[in-house]
Amino acid sequence: MTDRNGFVELGSLLILVIALLLQGCGGSGSGGGTTGNPPAAPTGLTATAGAGQVSLSWTASSGATSYNVLRGTADGGPYTQVGTSTATSYMDTNVTNGTTYYYVVTAVNSWGQSGNSNQISATPVPPPPAAPTNLTATAGNGQVSLSWTASKGASSYHVKRGTANGGPYSTIASPTATNYTDSTVTNGTTYYYVVTAVNAGGESGNSNQVSATPTGSFSGVAVDVNVLANRHTISPYIYGGAFPNDTTAISDSGLTVVRWGGNASSTYNWKLFTDNADNDYYFEDFTFCGLGVYPTCSDSDSAQFIKDVKAAGSQPLMTMVMLPWVAQSPEQSIQQGSGSNNYHWVFSVSQDGACSSKVDPYNTDAGINLESDCATTMVASSAQLNRTYYPLLDDHTQTCQAGTCEYRSDWAAALSTAFGSGTCSIPYSSITSCHFYDMDNEIDIWGGTHVDVHPNPSGYDELANTYWTEATKLKTWDTQAVRLGPVSCCWWFYWNGANGNDKNAHGGVDFLPWWLNEIYWQDQIASTRSLDIFDIHAYPDGPDTSGYSQAQKQALAVSIYRDYWDPTLVSPSGTINQQYTTYIQPNKTIAFRIPRMRAIANMIYPGTPLAFTEWSAAFAGESDFSTALGDADAYGILGRERMSLSTRWTAPQAANPNYQALKLYTNYDGSHHGFAPISVSATNNGDPNLFSSYAAVSADGKTLTLMVLNKDPQNSAQVQFALSGFNPASFVSYTLVVSAPNTITASSSQPWSAIQTFAPYSATVLVVTGSLANTPSSDWDLNPDVIMVPESGTVTLQPKLTSGTANVTLSSAVFDSFEGASACGGTLTLTDPVITPSQSGTITVNAGGVPGFCHFTVTGSDGTVTQTEGGWIVVGNPPADLAVSGGNNQSGNVGTTLPEPLAVTLTPGQSGGTATGASILFTTSAGTLSNGTTSGPKVIALTNSSGVASVTLTLPGTPQTVNVQAEAPYALGHAIANFTETAQ
């Protein structure tokens, strides 16, 4: 502390003196005062929001002299100081109602400020509004109009309704305006209304009560929707088609199935990608069209077709060739020359002397099956066939006699690989990986469409045996195959086949029932199933329209699909409207096509669903708007009537209005939202020629879709909806109308209105948002809902659960009055009314004594929700009689053949059948039966001209009683005869 000269520095001396003074005053050691610290952060901060204010309070911090209140409008800050308090509370009045604020508080003293307290948020709200005043109600026809005086500060109102004076009330709407029209009322019922005002602060008390009774006679169409009636899943596979333009069209239109089919597919060569057009076009070989139509073909490779269709979000339906020939090279790629191998058409003018005046205008050497005189039929020779076709064999165990052969087994293996793995949901209620196969195409008319390779009409036996053989083999080549058959052509051939008197040679049984019966029994004998879906083509038969005006054709196009379902429609077709078309079916001149065919399938081969793999009715042209309305009607019918699969011939083209009609069901909003999946009842009192309605709900019960078709070209349709079991809130409409035929127009969302008006010539989907009034714990079905039974016959229904686990108790089953239903006179008995997850119920049906269509309704409850299901009993002619006429009550040594054949006699009676050629199925409990050709525990024997069918029985190797049962055809009433034999 000295400088270099030895003197003490003045500054250092001063510091020393100050330090000594501080030491004496307690600057160190244990005596005297302390150095201060800021207080701890407050704790326990709470906030209470009020109207225009937020009240804060917290726990005091030790040593704090005041508190700073900080506020922000975002969680976690930043914060701005809004006030100071010396107390442990603060009232923030500088706030806006409805805004959320975030607060923290800090403690302060002379030594500084603490950190933040815990954060708390609060949202100041206004006080609830006052109750509305001056509520008035004006009753109208099917509606009640309400109005009231506004409540200050209200953001919306609750309209509440009851049917008793003083309540209770249920909220039916939440409008923001001071008026509301209630269109969900029933004329003649008195309703009581109150209104409350609502804001963020809460709900007011009730307004004054008013009452109103709507009256009047509604002159429009009444549509009654019941979401707890006739509930069933709509198969997604009903929205199919053949030959869409391309994969973009598949995806955009929402096609769920794309069919590879048609006459040409019956001769498809899977290696060369070719087909023969046969009688459709001069018997020439061409490149096959998988997608698109001539001349813009693509995907002629069948395996690539499958891959492309699946990539587009759809499911392929292939056609498995059952004819014995497939095409060679396409004719357009071959130069005409003198060598016969250069001619890829069957009937050549130059080579065969075919008629020269009936030739392909683009290839004048290709003719038809007429000799040079243009009158005599030319039958194709083996040389003609061999230059145009290759033989098609089942597999390589069969010998190719000469040249090139193709093999079904190889093709099926390639198709199976293209289909890929995955499960197939049966009964086809969801889109999965199904390997769908049509077993050829319209096999009943091969003798016409493919007369070159099949010169004779197809017979009953050929059609059954060929199908059963090839369908059974296909399952070994592709174990996931779903086989559709017989892919029958049309109404006349359903019942008569194509082979002259072949029907009378088979017991007089109509072709399709005979074929189905034969396949079922063959499957029973082989312990297999060869038929997965019963498939027919279903062009609604109409009259000769050659003299019709365009307006008449349009009227027919929008009404013709009544053919599918209407029990009252006497067909305008000269084919259907004939008593001689079928001798066995009831109501012969009424098509009733879907219920009738489903009833036949359920009677003969239980569990077999129905498909239409060709349908359309474009009487006024594919591009006409009437075709779009007809198609929209058809899609609704196919879903309501429980079809399993359908493919339109051909798929709608994007340039035509019916393309948009399909999208109303599959992609109405461009985002692939479509018609809901659970069909429900939607009856109406309109003229079915001019109006149709269909309904379905979503699986969660929050969406109801309604399809409304106004098929009247001149007049709007005013419609009053009654929704049972569903509480509607709002809806959006999607409309296709003749004035904008290629555009689906969407409305804005709006409150539900029970009365709406639909433009002339329009198709509209209403997508209604709401909720089920009650959600079923279990859904159930009649199993089956349609079946055929002979006059005075008996059949059993076995209702079962389709979803849920709650037991269902059936309370009633009655034949009822239904438009078009016959006066049945039969009975329905609830033999076992309880349905459980593990056990079906039982309803015994005793048919009446009059053939016809009998409608019935069954009611059941799961303990909370009551549902109804309706169905049809198709009552046929009286059954034929089947009686034992020999070989009963015999005894013989074990292992020996009884000396007398077991014989039965079929007496047709009033059944409509004949005695000759009927199939009788014999089944033995032990031993072996033989019909002289085949043997086993089950064999089929045919009746002779006297109606007698017989088999021999070889007794089993051990002593016992042997029971043998004989069954007559189902179409003749399925009479039973029994034998009792003894092995000793």
Predicted regions and their residues:
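Glycoside hydrolase catalytic-domain groove-lining segments
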Residues: 463, 469-477, 541-618
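Carbohydrate-binding surface patches
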Residues: 687-727, 764-769
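N-terminal catalytic cores of secreted or lumenal carbohydrate-active enzymes
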Residues: 218-550
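Beta-strand-rich modules
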Residues: 92-111, 182-201
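Pro/Thr/Ser/Gly-rich low-complexity, intrinsically disordered linker/stalk tracts
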Residues: 32-63, 97, 110-153, 187, ...
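The feature marks long extracellular or luminal low-complexity segments
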Residues: 838-840, 846-984
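C-terminal motif of bacterial Sec signal peptides marking the signal peptidase cleavage site
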Residues: 21-24
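Glycan-recognition and catalytic regions of carbohydrate-active enzymes
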Residues: 624, 635-705, 740
